[in-house]
Regions:
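Helical element adjacent to the flavin cofactor pocket in flavoenzyme catalytic cores
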Residues: 56-67, 89-151, 155
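Flavin (FAD/FMN) cofactor-binding and adjacent substrate-gating region
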Residues: 1-6, 26-111
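Glycine-rich active-site loop/strand segments that organize a redox cofactor
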Residues: 1-19
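Alpha-helical segment that forms one wall of the substrate-binding/catalytic cleft
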Residues: 19-27
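Long, contiguous hydrophobic alpha-helical segments, chiefly transmembrane helices and signal peptides
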Residues: 1, 21, 46, 103, ...
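Alpha-helix capping and helix-loop boundary segments enriched in small/acidic/polar residues
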Residues: 12-15, 100-103, 167
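Residue-level signal for pocket-adjacent positions within structured domains
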Residues: 4, 43, 77, 81, ...
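Flavin-dependent oxidoreductases
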Residues: 131-191
Length: 191
């Protein structure tokens, strides 16, 4: 993914984007703590390698993060170390990032929405925006009328369609993958 960002943003732009992503993780943790959001926030994430070639790629990624992005925190776990953590010898190894993290995304969103409401923000659900005007007196045009506000946040996923064509040209596709289960417990996780 970073190759794509370097092509589109240049070397310095890609570094800035990486740094922003690192800062965003700290912001998430701060918001979870400040607002008491119950979203199973946990620090640490491991990219695992199924094939030896995948592990070689993770090794290169670790080096690139350290050299190009001044991010020396990732640890390459060989098969034995990863197996000890996961209880499975299925993987060749993995790249563990202790500063990254994971959470339950829906619960995080619901917690942010509640924090916004607690701060006096009005959230209009199931009210599609047809058009908006930004600036000093933002205005949103909806089917049933207009919404005036002091600040406007476009929170419509990555694809806003005709609502914000200027933003559509600036969106870069990024894949995210989430699986959420109830907590398994130690015995069940090891089985």
């Amino acid at each position: 993914e970073m190759d794509t960002f370097r092509q589109q943003l240049g070397e310095q732009g890609a570094r800035q984007l990486w740094q922003m992503s690192v800062e965003a993780i700290d912001m998430i943790e701060q918001r979870v703590t400040q607002h008491g959001i119950a979203c199973d926030w946990t620090r640490g994430f491991c990219n695992v390698a199924v094939k030896p070639a995948h592990l070689a790629g993770l090794r290169e990624w670790q080096q690139e993060l350290a050299d190009r992005y001044q991010y020396p925190y990732c640890q390459l776990w060989e098969r034995e170390q990863l197996a000890a953590v996961l209880g499975s010898a299925r993987y060749q190894g993995g790249l563990y990032d202790p500063l990254s993290g994971h959470l339950h995304p829906l619960n995080y969103l619901l917690g942010l929405a509640q924090a916004a409401r607690d701060a006096g923000v009005a959230i209009y659900e199931n009210t599609p925006a047809l058009a908006f005007r930004s600036g000093e007196a933002p205005l949103v045009q909806c089917e049933g009328g207009k919404v005036r506000c002091r600040q406007l946040v476009l929170a419509g996923n990555a694809y806003l369609g005709k609502l914000a064509p200027a933003l559509n040209r600036r969106i870069m596709p990024v894949g995210t993958y989430v699986i959420a289960t109830e907590p398994l417990g130690e015995a069940r996780a090891r089985s």
